[in-house]
């Protein structure tokens, strides 16, 4: 359970609970794989840019989401949405993540995220949506995590789209 805002989410990670918790809402549980996946993303882009690249969590638990919205953020443990902390790099990083998702079979980034147990990786417009679920997943025999979904959701030219990369 996330309760103390300034404590690390997990030992060895540079995330505090404040990045996942909104004081206006109640405490919630978080899948351990999600901060590990975010750390894998931070590490990947820090190595690539050869400087510290921050990832900001923009959304987690939203219990007041309308019922017609997907339950990923409404029901704990919730999904997390995130963006690059550096506004100037957001489009570039999401574009790079999109490229990694499209070539997921050979992607070090995707492999490192899947190793954490995170099995839902979706680009949603301008953010990255990460989650763990047990249904509506594709089966990929031979992978460390065989059941996962990698894709992209969004709106383009006023029309919604959903692309599955895996």
Regions found by a protein language model. Give the residues of each.
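Generic low-complexity segments that are intrinsically disordered, proline-rich and/or Lys/Arg-biased
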Residues: 4-9, 24, 64-67, 71, ...
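A structural signal for short, well-ordered beta-strand segments and their strand-loop junctions
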Residues: 50-58, 122-123, 131
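Active-site nucleotide-donor binding segment shared across nucleotidyl transfer reactions
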Residues: 53-74
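Active-site acidic/histidine clusters and adjacent loop/turn architecture
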Residues: 1-52
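Generic hydrophobic secondary-structure signal
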Residues: 3, 34, 38, 55-57, ...
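Short secondary-structure junctions
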Residues: 45-54, 108-114
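Catalytic cores and adjacent binding grooves of peptidoglycan-active enzymes
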Residues: 71-166
């Amino acid at each position: 359970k996330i309760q103390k805002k300034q404590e690390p989410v997990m030992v060895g990670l540079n995330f505090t609970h404040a990045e996942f918790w909104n004081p206006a809402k109640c405490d919630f549980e978080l899948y351990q794989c999600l901060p590990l996946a975010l750390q894998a993303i931070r590490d990947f882009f820090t190595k690539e840019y050869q400087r510290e690249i921050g990832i900001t969590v923009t959304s987690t638990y939203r219990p007041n989401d309308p019922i017609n919205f997907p339950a990923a953020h409404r029901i704990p443990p919730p999904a997390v949405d995130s963006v690059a902390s550096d506004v100037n790099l957001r489009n570039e990083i999401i574009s790079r993540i999109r490229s990694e998702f499209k070539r997921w079979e050979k992607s070090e980034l995707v492999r490192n995220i899947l190793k954490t147990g995170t099995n839902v990786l979706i680009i949603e417009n301008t953010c990255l949506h990460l989650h763990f679920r047990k249904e509506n997943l594709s089966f990929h025999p031979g992978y460390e995590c065989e059941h996962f979904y990698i894709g992209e959701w969004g709106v383009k030219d006023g029309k919604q789209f959903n692309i599955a990369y895996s």
